[in-house]
């Protein structure tokens, strides 16, 4: 027996994009029809008339073919939209009969652990801002609540298989919520919530456990709080999450990988402070994450250092310093085989970053910043 898994939102979105594309092409063909189907002769002689008639015939043939292509395009979009509606209807139809079965399956674990066996965790609410944990076997963690006052709720953790919930956005002056941990066997960590500005820090991205990527840290868009650090990748495989940027505080550090995977990029510091350091790569293989930039313009922030490479991989590049005297970050080192990361450029009177060391067996050192 074969099974089909369809994301109805993606299918509907694709149908809408194709419909808009078809409308644009039809409008372009209509605009060009007058100039291409009735070409005026360059002169009164027979040769000019024959050339004009030839090009006009080509234009008319093109319009006929375009009309046929537009009809096929319209039929395809209708079929795609109908398929999305059919999948959505099937899901809605199946939900009712299957819900009692899920209730029976989840009843023992709900009674013992207050957690379902299968199913996604509920999103946070004003009364309980933290997202609920997903099912022990399969299920994503719920997203944290974004309140009008106070910190954002934390994302819920996944079970054995599933992704962690995203942290909620903090209110003015409050921190964003941390992302939830990914599934024990497979799943990505949730993204940290953004701060509401005015001093709040972005939430830390959730980490993966065995296989999966760490979640990105939350942004501190216009306050003095730091950007959230990226979550760590899974123990066996997975990239670290990217650190987030901050306006006045420091950028968040990129998450690290453990055995196989790339380190996450550090977050930028947009005005002052220091940009986030790039995450280190997995021990055996992976590239170090790039250090965050001290940004340009009226910034004195220092660039973040690049992350260290694995045994096989390249070191991360150091971030550039801000234009008003920020130091460039040092490039990350390679280990056995790989190139060192380039050092970041210093801004104004800021010192440039040093290039990372090349691999001991094979590899070039990174260039120093200027």
Curated annotation (Swiss-Prot):
Any single GO CC term annotated in Swiss-Prot or TrEMBL for this entry: cell surface
Record's subcellular location: Secreted, Cell wall; Cell surface
Parts forming coiled coils: none
Stretches for region UBA: 1-72
Keywords: Cell wall, Secreted, Virulence
Source organism, top-level taxon: Bacteria
Disruption phenotype: Deletion mutant shows enhanced viability, reduced p62 aggregation and reduced colocalization with LC3 and LAMP1 in bone marrow-derived murine macrophages (BMDMs).
InterPro entries, sorted: PE-PGRS_N, PGRS_rpt
Residue ranges of every copy of the PE domain listed in the record: 1-93
Keyword Protein biosynthesis: no
Record-marked site positions (Important for interaction with host ubiquitin): 64-65
Record's note on what induces expression: Up-regulated after infection of macrophages.
Family statement drawn from the similarity comment of this UniProt entry: Belongs to the mycobacterial PE family. PGRS subfamily.
Function: Mediates direct binding of host ubiquitin (Ub) to the mycobacterial surface, which triggers host xenophagy. Interaction between Rv1468c and ubiquitin recruits autophagy receptor p62 to deliver mycobacteria into LC3-associated autophagosomes. It could be a viable evolutionary strategy adopted by M.tuberculosis to maintain long-term intracellular survival through self-controlling its intracellular bacterial loads to avoid excessive host inflammatory immune responses.
UniProt domain comment: Contains a eukaryotic-like ubiquitin-associated (UBA) domain that mediates interaction with host ubiquitin.
Subunit structure: Interacts directly with host polyubiquitin in a UBA-dependent manner.
Name of the protein in question: Ubiquitin-binding protein Rv1468c
Gene: PE_PGRS29
